[in-house]
């Protein structure tokens, strides 16, 4: 009877094995009951000395497979300080003295407490805790514009209007073209210019030192108006109902002319007769004032 070929279960490096049979050609009955990992010679003759391995409930003679040495070069990052391989030479032909010297150099280097310390040039490859410095918080420096210098204090995006002279030109007639220079400041009070409003003269600022043809003409007209008598209506301080008309003469004197008899009602007595002033008396009072109406202007009346 040819031996039956079987395969192991759960192994990566599986290879075919041949189970050992009894003298009568059957498998051992007690092989399935053997515990896992047992090396007992279950139902095997005394002449067999190969250790038995129970895998997946079946008895096999699998021996430990020794893999070939790795050809990958170990880097310093993969070697731990407590690893025994650092003290033993590997199969690459490294001498024991070189390994011991390297282990002494690594053990002598102090541990770094901070990750932001700048390492020495010879420790860049050996220090596994080295990290580059963080990005700078300044956005201009993080963009790489280190050579650009911007002076933001001297820039004035909103120029103020203080202490700046502005030229204002007033144009009404060809004779009144002049410039008024003003300085704006928050502390200066608001001042309104005094303007003379006349029919023939333009709007000009009153200045006693400024002599122009327009101002001379305006002063002449004002002098003529003052020489003419004018009638002004004033309210009396004694009573609000009575009105007194004063006539101004060329000499500057004013003569009151009462007109209360025209504005007030006649008084009625208990008998029903009304008391009226005689007309001759009022006419006599008007004629005694001796007013020269020839010099009065009809437009002012």
From Swiss-Prot:
Protein name: Securin
Keywords on record: Cell cycle, Cell division, Chromosome partition, Cytoplasm, Mitosis, Nucleus, Repeat, Ubl conjugation
Main location: cytoplasm
Taxonomic lineage from the root: Eukaryota, Fungi, Dikarya, Ascomycota, Taphrinomycotina
Entry function: Regulatory protein, which plays a central role in chromosome stability. Probably acts by blocking the action of key proteins. During the mitosis, it blocks separase/cut1 function, preventing the proteolysis of the cohesin complex and the subsequent segregation of the chromosomes. At the onset of anaphase, it is ubiquitinated, conducting to its destruction and to the liberation of cut1.
Written domain comment of the UniProt record: The N-terminal destruction boxes (D-box 1 and D-box 2) act as a recognition signal for degradation via the ubiquitin-proteasome pathway.
PTM annotation, UniProt: Ubiquitinated by the anaphase promoting complex (APC) at the onset of anaphase, conducting to its degradation.
Organism this protein belongs to: Schizosaccharomyces pombe (strain 972 / ATCC 24843) (Fission yeast)
GO function term, MF aspect, one: endopeptidase inhibitor activity
Assembly mode: Interacts with the caspase-like cut1, and prevents its protease activity probably by covering its active site.
Region (Disordered): 1-55, 82-120, 218-284
Family per record: Belongs to the securin family.
PANTHER family on file: SECURIN, SECURIN-3
């Amino acid at each position: 009877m040819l031996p039956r070929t079987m395969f192991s279960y759960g192994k990566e490096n599986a290879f075919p094995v041949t189970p050992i049979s009894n003298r009568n050609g059957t498998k051992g009955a007690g092989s399935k009951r053997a515990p896992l990992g047992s090396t007992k010679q279950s139902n095997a003759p005394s002449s067999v000395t190969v250790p038995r391995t129970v895998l997946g409930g079946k008895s096999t003679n699998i021996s430990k497979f020794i893999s070939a040495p790795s050809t990958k070069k170990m880097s310093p990052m993969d070697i731990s300080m407590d690893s025994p391989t650092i003290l033993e030479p590997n199969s690459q032909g490294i001498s024991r003295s070189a390994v011991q010297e390297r282990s002494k150099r690594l053990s002598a280097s102090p541990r770094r407490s901070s990750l932001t310390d700048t390492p020495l040039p010879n420790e860049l490859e050996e220090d596994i805790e080295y990290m580059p410095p963080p990005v700078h918080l300044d956005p201009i420096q993080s963009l790489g514009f280190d050579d650009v210098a911007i002076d933001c204090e001297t820039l004035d995006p909103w120029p103020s209007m203080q202490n700046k002279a502005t030229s204002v030109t007033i144009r009404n007639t060809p004779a009144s073209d002049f410039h008024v220079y003003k300085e704006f400041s928050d502390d200066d009070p608001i001042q309104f210019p005094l303007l003379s409003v006349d029919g023939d003269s333009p709007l000009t600022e009153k200045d006693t030192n400024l002599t122009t043809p327009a101002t001379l003409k305006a002063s002449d007209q004002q002098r003529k108006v003052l020489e003419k008598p004018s009638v002004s209506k004033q309210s009396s301080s004694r009573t609000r109902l009575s009105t007194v008309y004063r006539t101004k003469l060329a000499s500057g004197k004013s003569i009151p002319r009462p007109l209360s008899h025209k504005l007030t009602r006649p008084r009625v007595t208990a008998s029903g007769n009304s008391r009226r002033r005689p007309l001759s008396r009022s006419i006599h009072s008007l004629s005694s004032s001796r007013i020269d109406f020839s010099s009065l202007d009809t437009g002012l009346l």
